[in-house]
Amino acid sequence: MMKKSFYLYVLTFRGGDWSDPKVRFAEEMFHEHNFPKQSTDFNELSNYIESYATENLTIEAFDHLWELYEGQA
């Protein structure tokens, strides 16, 4: 079975406690129309985040979410 995209994984954090950087990242990512939604590639995703970082779409939150994403069974 193919692993779901990082985008679909992060969407599971939407609607949570706004004090959580993962939640803020998920909400911001959802509204980014050019986000690489099908990607499972770290370099493609991190390059996008580095290029389009915002107050909520941070590389720190991305790194934490990527660790969680990679840790999935």
From Swiss-Prot:
Family matches, as Pfam families: YozE_SAM_like (PF06855)
Domain of life assignment: Bacteria
Annotated family: Belongs to the UPF0346 family.
Protein name: UPF0346 protein Bsph_2735
